[in-house]
């Protein structure tokens, strides 16, 4: 069939030449078998077999538009419309009998039209392309003058002045010279470069370990420029080999080693890119099968592959492969979020090609990471087998689940997720787990579904991906808002967190006054005994009695049952006052707030307040003994005036010292109860209402407790002033002991003085004041009062000195409230003047 087509084409060419030559008046009846005609026919075949092409793009539509515009500018609008209609019909005709190369035919008609116009205008068309003709001369070509005289071109295609086609001969000689300088043809080198691009050694292009790359073997004779170009093109193979090796090694290590899901996704993304690369190489290999034409023929052939064309084809794959090789080097020792973050840094690029490529790669790589975020935020599930997520879980006790159960792993936090967003992600998942594990609550599922609906995402897998950071932040914000609100509602309503805080304030911080006073009254005598002789069960009975005798009996029974007596570790010399304390039992989930360390702080505050209450109770006891109606001066009329003066002086000294101590204790207790406890509670209540999540609640409670500890002089920085305060407490308790002895002695002296006249014979016991008579009574009374006065003076001096030291330390404290305490204690500047005189 192909031979028939060729013969048909040859016959058509012969007929065309015969008709053209027959138009020459000199040869009207030319014999087709004559030597002159055969020479002309061979010349025509040389023209047709040449590679000469026009210097315009093969665009039929452009040629047609050019012709239509030309007709329109010449004022031939009707011809332009007719041409446009004819061309539309011509271009739309397809199938058998239609012209395949429509552009060539339209271009031919254009050239014929231009040639005829040139002939009409008297131009020498042979100047452009001499006509094909047969003359009488020996070479068979008409002279230029004859052609002009005869003027018979009539639009015949004119060829160059090179009837012997010398340019084609020169091109062929150049091709022969190139072949002599190269042992290997360019087609072979192209195929070898394609092999090298797949990491395979070719026949002449092989991997050279010395230069760490592919290159033409030194023994092969090729031009230096060709060798350099092959080396540059083969860089793609070196990069491919690097990427392919990384993928293979990573897959070989899985699942024995922790490649991780992000690492697997990275390998899958690289493999997808290599698959596209393989497709490109398949296309190039198909083109490489076509021979490379000569330089003179190159313009008419498109489906061949040379080294220069290969460099154009390799431009885009080279950029991508270089990026992949850089990422492979960067990610060899990375995994999880760290790997995703490292890849993300390379996506910040101004080149659209690089940016789009990295975005496509990151969408695949970050898919497992975003799935972990979705699962954690909406389900509280930590699906992280290989430790790739930036949230890390660890086994802990239930009470430590919120504080220590989950932490951020900064090394695994990708750079496209901000630290604040990571904290919200961490807290949201923690809230779900806290509700599920500690609160035994499942209402979080509805809150998570509402959050997903509000953010426009789905609760199913694949709902989020790289490049959707705003959508992720919106989802996390909505989920955190709803789940945290649900968590606080559960704590406040179901577990009565506020009520428990108030119960601790009433009983551990001694805010329930009647309960504290009654407990102090009934337990005080028992606590004066040695600690080893006191039973905790007996003290628990006292506690229950105090509850029943006060308004505490109307509180929630569950909260009262949590209040227990605790005996602290003690030695042989400790009294009950030193070891007695109350504790509050915190159960799940409240033990997340009231941890052991928090309860230990409450214990310290209770012990401090209990000491303060004990001192206040002691001063009240002294006042009850000192009431004026207990002692009348008429009872001592029979005593000597000196002894009576000693008695009045001792009583007055005792009352003055009591007033000083009572002034200090009253103002200090007012400061503790109102400016410390009540103010701190008021602030805590406001912050508790404003809390948006459990972290806010924990921070508010910690701030509340730290404020109490700091303002109550229980902090580490207040150790010196606290020791000074405890010295004052000890002096007040010593004063209580001496005051009791004084009034016991006075009471006995009062009784003996009344009975001295009536019962002289009844009180003859050895050592009795009365047994020695009135003189002896007076002497013993004087000695007793003198001793008590000395003790009172000693306590007064120590108290004044200690109080002065305490007041001097108050202005040095950081808390402003303590400075106001100084103003309350020394509002008349009595101690300041006393200190300045001293």
Swiss-Prot record:
<dbReference type="Pfam" id="PF17681">
    <property type="entry name" value="GCP_N_terminal"/>
</dbReference>
<comment type="function">
    <text>Gamma-tubulin complex is essential for the control of microtubular network remodeling in the course of initiation and development of giant-feeding cells, and for the successful reproduction of nematodes (e.g. Meloidogyne spp.) in their plant hosts.</text>
</comment>
<dbReference type="GO" id="GO:0000930">
    <property type="term" value="C:gamma-tubulin complex"/>
</dbReference>
<dbReference type="GO" id="GO:0043015">
    <property type="term" value="F:gamma-tubulin binding"/>
</dbReference>
<dbReference type="GO" id="GO:0015631">
    <property type="term" value="F:tubulin binding"/>
</dbReference>
<dbReference type="GO" id="GO:0005737">
    <property type="term" value="C:cytoplasm"/>
</dbReference>
<dbReference type="GO" id="GO:0005819">
    <property type="term" value="C:spindle"/>
</dbReference>
<keyword id="KW-0539">Nucleus</keyword>
<dbReference type="InterPro" id="IPR040457">
    <property type="entry name" value="GCP_C"/>
</dbReference>
<keyword id="KW-0493">Microtubule</keyword>
<keyword id="KW-0206">Cytoskeleton</keyword>
<feature type="region of interest" description="Triggers nucleus envelope localization">
    <location>
        <begin position="200"/>
        <end position="256"/>
    </location>
</feature>
<dbReference type="InterPro" id="IPR041470">
    <property type="entry name" value="GCP_N"/>
</dbReference>
<dbReference type="GO" id="GO:0007020">
    <property type="term" value="P:microtubule nucleation"/>
</dbReference>
<keyword id="KW-0963">Cytoplasm</keyword>
<dbReference type="GO" id="GO:0090063">
    <property type="term" value="P:positive regulation of microtubule nucleation"/>
</dbReference>
<dbReference type="GO" id="GO:0055028">
    <property type="term" value="C:cortical microtubule"/>
</dbReference>
<comment type="similarity">
    <text>Belongs to the TUBGCP family.</text>
</comment>
<protein>
    <recommendedName>
        <fullName>Gamma-tubulin complex component 3</fullName>
    </recommendedName>
</protein>
<dbReference type="GO" id="GO:0009624">
    <property type="term" value="P:response to nematode"/>
</dbReference>
<dbReference type="InterPro" id="IPR042241">
    <property type="entry name" value="GCP_C_sf"/>
</dbReference>
<comment type="subunit">
    <text>Part of the gamma-tubulin complex. Gamma-tubulin complex is composed of gamma-tubulin and GCP proteins. Interacts directly with GCP2, GIP1 and GIP2.</text>
</comment>
<feature type="region of interest" description="Mediates interactions with GIP1 and GIP2">
    <location>
        <begin position="1"/>
        <end position="199"/>
    </location>
</feature>
<dbReference type="Pfam" id="PF04130">
    <property type="entry name" value="GCP_C_terminal"/>
</dbReference>
<comment type="function">
    <text>Gamma-tubulin complex is necessary for microtubule nucleation at the microtubule organizing centers (MTOCs). Required for the positioning of the gamma-tubulin-containing complex on pre-existing microtubules and for the proper organization of cortical arrays.</text>
</comment>
<dbReference type="GO" id="GO:0009898">
    <property type="term" value="C:cytoplasmic side of plasma membrane"/>
</dbReference>
<dbReference type="InterPro" id="IPR007259">
    <property type="entry name" value="GCP"/>
</dbReference>
<dbReference type="GO" id="GO:0005938">
    <property type="term" value="C:cell cortex"/>
</dbReference>
<dbReference type="GO" id="GO:0005635">
    <property type="term" value="C:nuclear envelope"/>
</dbReference>
<dbReference type="GO" id="GO:0000922">
    <property type="term" value="C:spindle pole"/>
</dbReference>
<dbReference type="GO" id="GO:0005874">
    <property type="term" value="C:microtubule"/>
</dbReference>
